[in-house]
């Protein structure tokens, strides 16, 4: 009997256990993995993907024409362990007839929790307060010391009322938010009804909101959306939060707005680039809280993401419907 030819799968990083187990149990696949928690160097990715039928990658892996050329004609499926797909050269992938799987929905709640945590941390100045306790700055009670801004009776503006934007609004509503505004490509009256959210223009949202949360996808239309003009329209008491993509924000303009007191504070879970250099001007500001892109970082969510990414890959290799396929 002629031996069955195995399909080669290349995985660009150590992924959580549930995804690893699913791939290991696939008798029709030969799995090779970059055995590190650190990003795979481009040259190693080119080497590893050569001849592969399937590629399981992460958001930090830039799958461009060079990588696709290195993979060759065997490559049939790319599965990314992310909801974002801006790291994939989609036009080139579509041209080659390669199917793409991704992991939406499973990280919605976790990312929304992080957004609310970051908003509260930023508006109530928690990092500053912790530092004052540690360095001896806490000497006595003072009427205005470390005063921040509260959510009760506030106006919250959400840029992008998609799955994550809605989940954020749902969690903020019990804090006594008086008014929700949102902006996007088009009104979403059915989704907005739950929060009585009003569809407004981006300039209106900037001018009227006490808190702004960016939760949109990165597209040509949203790249650099939050710039000098945007920040100049904001209230001086407003707090700006970004949990979408770093490139939605002009970080030089954000720095100027924060340093000059044009806006009160900002909290970022995403930056450009990632990681942000330790000498970046934003890191010198007390009124800017920056996290290392941990929106989906819970054990349960990351395991679920890895399993979905593995199942997408295996289904694609076998010519079956993927649990979550990106329509190209």
Curated annotation (Swiss-Prot):
UniProt GO molecular function: carboxylic acid binding; glyoxylate reductase (NADPH) activity; hydroxypyruvate reductase (NADH) activity; hydroxypyruvate reductase (NADPH) activity; hydroxypyruvate reductase [NAD(P)H] activity; NAD binding; NADPH binding; protein homodimerization activity
Subunit structure as annotated in this protein's UniProt entry: Homodimer.
PANTHER family xref list: 2-HYDROXYACID DEHYDROGENASE-RELATED (PTHR10996), GLYOXYLATE REDUCTASE_HYDROXYPYRUVATE REDUCTASE (PTHR10996:SF137)
Active site: 293
GO biological process: carboxylic acid metabolic process; dicarboxylic acid metabolic process; glyoxylate metabolic process
Enzyme class: oxidoreductase
EC numbers on record: 1.1.1.79, 1.1.1.81
Binding sites annotated in the UniProt record for NADP(+): 162-164, 185-188, 217, 243, 295
Protein name: Glyoxylate reductase/hydroxypyruvate reductase
Gene that specifies this protein: GRHPR
């Amino acid at each position: 009997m002629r031996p069955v030819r195995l399909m080669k799968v290349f995985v660009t990083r150590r992924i959580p256990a549930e995804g690893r187990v699913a791939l290991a149990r696939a008798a029709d696949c030969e799995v090779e993995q970059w055995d590190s928690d650190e990003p795979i160097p481009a040259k190693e990715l080119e080497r590893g993907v050569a001849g592969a039928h399937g590629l399981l990658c992460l958001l930090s892996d830039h799958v461009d024409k060079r990588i696709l050329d290195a993979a060759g004609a065997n490559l049939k499926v790319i599965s990314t362990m992310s909801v974002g797909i801006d790291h994939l050269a989609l036009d080139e992938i579509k041209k080659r007839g390669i199917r793409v799987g991704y992991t939406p929905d499973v990280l919605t709640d976790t990312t929304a929790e992080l957004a609310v945590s970051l908003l509260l941390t930023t508006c109530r100045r928690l990092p500053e307060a912790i530092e004052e306790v540690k360095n001896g700055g806490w000497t006595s009670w003072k009427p205005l010391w470390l005063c921040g801004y509260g959510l009760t009776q506030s106006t919250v503006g959400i840029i992008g009322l998609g799955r994550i934007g809605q989940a954020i609004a749902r969690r903020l509503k019990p804090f006594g938010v008086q008014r929700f505004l949102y902006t996007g490509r088009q009104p979403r009256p059915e989704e907005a009804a739950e929060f009585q959210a009003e569809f407004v223009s981006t300039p209106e949202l900037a001018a009227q909101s006490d808190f702004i949360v960016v939760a949109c996808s990165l597209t040509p239309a949203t790249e650099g959306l939050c710039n000098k003009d945007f920040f100049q329209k904001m209230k001086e008491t407003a707090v700006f939060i970004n949990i979408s993509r770093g490139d939605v924000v002009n970080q030089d303009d954000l720095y100027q707005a924060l340093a000059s007191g044009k806006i009160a504070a900002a909290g970022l879970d995403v930056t450009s680039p990632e990681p942000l250099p330790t000498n970046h001007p934003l890191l010198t500001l007390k009124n800017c809280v920056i996290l290392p892109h941990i929106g989906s970082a819970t054990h349960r969510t990351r395991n679920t993401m890895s399993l979905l990414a593995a199942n997408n890959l295996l289904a694609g290799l076998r010519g079956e419907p993927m649990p979550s396929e990106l329509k190209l």
